[in-house]
């Protein structure tokens, strides 16, 4: 008969230990969520809010739509001519002159590569150990 209470006590300890183990497994990792590949890129785009820019452009366009509703058709043709001439001018200039690239950038190709290295490091760490939303938002 002494075996029965001991067996029940052992069973109770085993159930409580199993429940405790399940609780620790269900908790989020202290490093955040593990994201690899496409999931990481999607999380960066979602966190940085790429579509927010398009929404703000559309709202600004709708707000200005009523202001320019009574323009004449001659202005449209003048705008087309101006765009054609600016496109022609863009083709005649070098890309550095047209875009205003600073000459120092041409001498240091590694300077632009630094941000890619940060992205690669964070993406590999996020895949291995997980990362938080604040770490992902540091890329914005």
Curated annotation (Swiss-Prot):
Subcellular location: Secreted
Disulfide bonds: 36-127, 48-140, 126-131
Keyword set, alphabetical order: Cleavage on pair of basic residues, Disulfide bond, Hormone, Secreted, Signal
Organism superkingdom: Eukaryota
SMART domains associated with the record: IlGF
GO molecular function, a single term: G protein-coupled receptor binding
Signal peptide, first to last residue: 1-26
Protein family per UniProt: Belongs to the insulin family.
Record's protein name: Relaxin-3
């Amino acid at each position: 008969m002494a075996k029965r209470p001991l067996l029940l006590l052992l069973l109770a300890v085993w159930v409580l230990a199993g429940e405790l183990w399940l609780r620790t497994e269900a908790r989020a990792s202290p490093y955040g969520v593990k994201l690899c590949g496409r999931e990481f890129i999607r999380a960066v785009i979602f966190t940085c809010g790429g579509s927010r820019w398009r929404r703000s452009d559309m709202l600004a366009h709708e707000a200005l739509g009523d202001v320019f509703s009574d323009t004449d058709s001659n202005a449209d043709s003048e705008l087309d001519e101006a765009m054609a001439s600016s496109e022609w001018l863009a083709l005649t200039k070098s890309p550095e002159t047209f875009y205003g690239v600073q000459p120092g950038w041409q001498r240091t190709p590694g300077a632009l590569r630094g941000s890619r290295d940060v992205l690669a490091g964070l993406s590999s760490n996020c895949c291995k150990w997980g990362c938080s939303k604040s770490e992902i938002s540091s890329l914005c």
